[in-house]
Amino acid sequence: IITHPPEDYHSDHRSLSHHVKSSAGFKYPLLFCETLMGVNFNPNIYIDISEYFKDKAKAILKHKSQNPVKFLNAVEINNKFRAAQCNAGGQSYAEVFRFEPTFPFVDLRYLLPSTMPIRPYYKNIPSSLI
């Protein structure tokens, strides 16, 4: 189950998070999704959505009540930033989640698509500094 984090900026989202967590009990694992601009959110799961970002953008633009053009711009910036945290190149996008292990779910990687590959970053350092 994917829900808002308990520390979300919006009181309705915090309330929903609490009720979803209570309802899930010990039956279902929870993933917390990121707030719009990642405020106070520390993810531990990164999912490559590059292949699906155009579909996501089309869906956002259909959500007329949320100022979709402005919203889409913020989402695009955030998804690019999260991909950059994995050193992804070019037109890469990532969505992030936080999983907090709770009994009996200590590892749910088997349920998720593979995470974004982390590309190494090399920097030439003058030998005099080594």
Predicted regions mapped to residue ranges:
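Metal-dependent de-N-acetylase/amidase catalytic core
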Residues: I1-I130
